[in-house]
Amino acid sequence: MVHRTEPPDGGWGWMVVLSAFFQSALVFGVLRSFGVFFVEFVAAFEEQAARVSWIASIGIAVQQFGSPIGSALSTKLGPRPVVMTGGILAALGMLLASFATSLTHLYLSIGLLSGSGWALTFTPTLACLSRYFSQRRSLAMGLALTGVGISSFAFAPLFQWLLNNYAWRGALLLVSALSLHLVACGALLRPLSLTEDTAVGGPWAQITSLLCHGPFLRYTVALTLINTGYFIPYVHLVAHLQDLGWDPLPAAFLLSVAAISDLVGRVASGWLGDAVPGPVARLLMLWTTLTGVSLALFPVAQASTTLVVLAVAYGFTSGALTPVAFSVIPELVGTGRIYCGLGLVQMIESVGGLLGAPLSGYLRDVTGNYTASFVVAGAFLLAGSGVLITLPHFFSCISLSTSRPQDLVIEAPDTKIPLPKEEGLGEN
């Protein structure tokens, strides 16, 4: 383990960025492209859209709800063994899914087992990355998360090609092989010890203090609302386009168009997050609002050109909000608590990930089309952007990380934990 007084803002941190790049591709790139499998599962098991939607929703929810476990294990054991174990579980889940004979099997294999593997990989990696960077944190986060955009661009048509040539069982076998590369990504994570770590207490003390922290709780509410609508296009856009008369392959390529725009948005947002003065939460509110508007406009579009424009707009803004969403957390809780803070955020926002796609599928079953599904998804994002305005210093011209007054001690049951006042812990 490397010991430092403060984040190095580079060095081995760039290898952690590389690891996070491939991990984000192999976790959320797969999840975002799973809409290609959606139509196949509906036909294979002769089930309603709402029931099939639970496969991806359970996977997202387990990944997020199990994040505190991955965070606590990483605090004790370091991120490397935890992430490598998660890679094995993710691959095993996809392998078992290829033998499924019912939706229940897919709920357990992809949703529960692969979701558990994703919980042990994604959050510890991003937390490790946040500890390596301070001044360039948003840029590093943006570069790392471009893996989602690149893989979404590549995986959607790739998965459709695999389905056409090997059917869904053979395609899942190959996705399992891809997921096994998460083990190699975990090997790149070198633990970093910071001076701040000695003052934050153990995992339970950190969790207790965060649950008493008003701004942190409001932020988790905002992300939960955002998460409810965020993934809807990646689950139901292909099906929506097929309802409009599109062939499966062109519909999958529209996801790729959104993925290219997503990639550009992540890099641009990461650069802006470090370059623009003021709290990063303001940028997050802007991108969230624009994402919600573009989602709500999808049912209005009928022409191919209009749908492509909306896909580009949605891809850019949804990609742009992701790196700044993760960059706000260390500003609120400090780098010493980033493992537990990020884990708690992922757990609480899992409620949105669990309910979003099934709600969208239910609205489609009731109304006969996806109009209400996309409008409601956009409304959830707009509601989340409204909550972001309540964060401390939102209207200030100075970022939370630029001022560092004296420490403040917050009392939790049976423990006293010194916390930096600049991180908003004195505000409720």
From Swiss-Prot:
Its main location: Golgi. The chain crosses the membrane at residues 11-31, 52-72, 81-101, 106-126, 139-159, 172-192, 221-241, 244-264, 283-303, 309-329, 338-358, 374-394. Keywords: Cell membrane, Golgi apparatus, Membrane, Symport, Transmembrane, Transmembrane helix, Transport. PROSITE patterns: MFS. Residues 1-10, 395-428 are cytoplasmic. Coiled coil: none annotated. It is a multi-pass membrane protein. GO terms for molecular function: monocarboxylic acid transmembrane transporter activity; symporter activity. CDD domains: MFS_MCT11_13. It is found in: Golgi apparatus membrane; Cell membrane. The keyword Protease does not apply. Pfam families: MFS_1. GO terms for cellular component: Golgi apparatus; Golgi membrane; plasma membrane. Belongs to the major facilitator superfamily. Monocarboxylate porter (TC 2.A.1.13) family. Proton-linked monocarboxylate transporter. May catalyze the transport of monocarboxylates across the plasma membrane. This is Monocarboxylate transporter 13. It comes from Rattus norvegicus (Rat).
